[in-house]
């Protein structure tokens, strides 16, 4: 059986591993699939009675979506508790004075109240040498309901900058780490694009991928997605210099409550990045078609941002209103081993002035692993798509 890009084993072996994990944890699994060819699969984990089910959602063709949903459910089950288990309290001053975090927008907001202690997790760089104390709240979206005793920081003014980007599950740490870093780069580039086009208005056009340049497998996926969504799909090249390719996919005429829904994907392999974006686009529309909570969340986002013109424009993300220039998809690069792939990702980030730190936060003898990647220089403005009242972490007003 074929092993998918950025994966270490077949889907069958990957499924067996995660199902063994859930079985040993006495967790019951319920799967629901939405879609015929390309689809969204929702997995619900049911634990002991009286606890709320935990969900995960997968994308792609049926088997891929099903396995992806299981791993995302594992991520949602263990990620935040695992991070908290690895956290400690540190003097606030020593954390924010680290060179890598100096001037970071959410932390400068917190500093105004002069807290004494803050919860942080220690990460190491790609060489396993230099360490970074990473404030827990920046990644743990549920921390505000589980604040560690002794943490004296008032997070109320900065919690809107919290993002769980950078946590990923996989078969083995290397696979999980690749996906964790990819997610951070994806959010970073998406945030920059939204800031330049809709917040500051310094970028007047987007780069649209000429879909005739897609290789056969990506072209088939593209056509399947257009059939599944009954609409024409556009693909935007959102890549930033020196970083791996990032693409956004959106429907030309399928907004939800006036908000354009888009999928995003990042990979060293441009065709795989496009595939991830297209699959996520289908996933989101299938969820919108089948779950009223999706529309309810969009209504909340609108309510939060309607009075903030630039933020509301960034939420709506009307890419079709912008001019465009056609670009070709780059030729596929040579296949790398997973270890080479991970090394290349971290090296590119470092070369771009955006170093990443990694940590395995959970693992199991079955072979499953949870990785957390953090990038202090990540642009967090993509959080506007969740209805958060945020501003770009840096100014793009002078960039054309």
Language model regions located:
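Helix-biased "structured C-terminal domain" signature
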Residues: 1-400
